[in-house]
UniProtKB/Swiss-Prot annotation:
The species this protein was found in: Conus victoriae (Queen Victoria cone)
Lineage summary: Eukaryota, Metazoa, Spiralia, Lophotrochozoa, Mollusca
Tissues where the protein occurs: Expressed by the venom duct.
GO MF term list: ion channel inhibitor activity; toxin activity
Entry function: Inhibits voltage-gated ion channels.
Localization per record: Secreted
Protein name: Conotoxin Vc6.16
Cysteine disulfide partners in this protein: C48-C62, C55-C66, C61-C71
Pfam families, alphabetized: Conotoxin
Amino acid sequence: MQKLIILLLVAAVLMSTQALFQEKRPKEKIDLLSKRKTDAEKQQKRYCSDDSQPCSHFYDCCKWSCNNGYCP
């Protein structure tokens, strides 16, 4: 009987720790996605070379046209 109680306690502890780890993982994924989004926004705000000429080819947003010196 004592072995059964100990086994149930161990199972409960394992399940609770697993639930804690599962709660932390989605937050990390969301943080990574938001970081990627802000990095992309920074690249889009990169200054372009000249309004009258096509932008430099270093950034895709500047390949085709400039908008007041900034990526459109």
